[in-house]
Amino acid sequence: MAQFRLQGSKVLAVDMTGDAVKAKNGAMVAYDGQMAFKKMSGGGEGLRGMVTRRLTGEQMTVMEVKGHGTCYFADRASEINLVQLQGEKLFVEAGNLLCTDAALRTGTTFTGLRGASQGNGLFTTTVEGSGQAAITSHGPAVVLRVTKQYPLQVDPGAYVAHTGDLKQHLQSGVNFRTFIGEGSGEAFQIRFEGEGLVYVQPSERNTVGGEV
């Protein structure tokens, strides 16, 4: 299996001995040894995946990289975070998924209003199986644990990804204090309940709700 490691905080190095990985198209910045690159349609999920992604708007263009040596990946100087999966599922925005083991399965799932509040579509990308994945964030991501006793509220623009058995609810932060100018200015939050981990970035995207 390919070995993922960070070269600094913004470059992913993947050591391969005949292995293969799936990476965001155009993310390769350097390599040594012998590598072969092949563009994959539909996020590497075949014809069905391509049709699904076109219908859902959750576009993801990936390439397969296979060979012997080390390949280096980066995406616009974003911070890179490694996620080790052991049979569970990772939920991540397609734009934040940099690279995965080739054996990991990707797909799409419905997110409803949570995705719309982020300025994204109503669907998000899933990564499932056993292996490693690399995701990007604007600034070093913070990994926050959610338990049944301690749910978590996250600004939609700061959300990157999550794992575990979590339920999501979009809740409004608008109340009387907001209208009189004493509120937080955060129109919506995502409430996570259950057991799992949430990856949060220290930089907010522009969201539909914005600031009130």
Predicted regions and their residues:
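Phosphate/adenylate-binding glycine loop and adjacent helical scaffold
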Residues: 1-212
